[in-house]
């Protein structure tokens, strides 16, 4: 039986420059669940082709909040691209929520979107379509292959940093300048 390293839930997963997979190159993911069966996260720096207004309209939810309508919906990853995921900072009891850690939550139910449209939603929220998933041991293997860095989750990176700056900002929080790293790695 293998021993699971420290669970990575509530960590930011930061793609290293050598990671060439177009889905994950220069990406930042919030790891929402991690155990011996695998990991699940949501990419937090990839805009999709949709705005929140378009998604709400498709769901039959009206809002007069122009800022909310123009909010970009993120491409959260290649798994379940038809499902919505809301990362937020509101501890209210939504129909389907998971506390990721330190005041950050993941909700997958319609009620949070209805509350947001009515002006009664979380103060900070990211909406994504799809998520990223790793099978048992897969994320640990990729970390060992130097594909990713990890950093503690940071509300400023998630909610206050521009999408295009999140990759470099997340790494900078742990003292890493990604532009000074090479795009290849070795093993001793």
From Swiss-Prot:
Highest taxon in the source lineage: Bacteria
InterPro entries: AlgH-like (IPR003774)
Any Gene Ontology CC annotation: cytosol
SUPFAM superfamilies named among the record's database cross-references: VC0467-like
UniProt family annotation: Belongs to the UPF0301 (AlgH) family.
NCBIfam families, per the entry: PRK00228.1-1
Name of the featured protein: UPF0301 protein XCC2748
